[in-house]
Amino acid sequence: YSAHLFLRDRGKFKQIALGDYQAQFGQGLTFWSGRAFGKGADILMIKRSATGLRPYASVDETLFLRGGGLTYELGKFEITGFYSYKKIDGNVIIQDTSGLAQEEIEAINQEGLSISSLQQTGFHRTPNELEDKDAITQQQMGGHVAYKTRSLNIGATGIFSKIDAKFERSLQPYSQFRNQESEQAKVGLDYNWIYRNFNFFGEVSQSIDAGKAITSGAIVMLDPK
């Protein structure tokens, strides 16, 4: 099921979202819910166009937020805050407690739910897939502050995400650099500047575990027409 209430341009409130919605900021390094298509034959696709908050009206089970958010206009600034709470799928690890003492079993239970990965296929066909359905609670909260003029947009984004399960780290080589923390926090700065026939854009982001990312680009129109 999915439902939402979405309002635009209600006085100083530019966007008000309740229920299922999406949030997109900057170039997506810090936070972007929903799909974003990469570069193709059309070179203009190298730049993402963030919409801020938007209603969710698709069928994918993972690419949305469930809760509420709003965007408030204050002069040349737009301030956005949002919160999401929903159940998501995860590959649950069943601990084998046969032959263990009661104290050991209680210690395992106190550690809470363990998962090997998050499931994003949306399939619930087999007993294992049904067991993984809605196994984890995910909470996300964050905000974005943007300064906007006719030719320049500068924004700052912060996001905190938490799930109520811990990852069992895989020993496979491809998993060694995968973020497997139950709590994540990121901050980022983004910009978009139009000067004559030039459009410069980009974003820099950093996570709480010191991971960094940066993207920057430019679109140049050789003819003003």
Task: Locate the predicted segments by residue.
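Outer-membrane beta-barrel channel domains
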Residues: Y1-K225
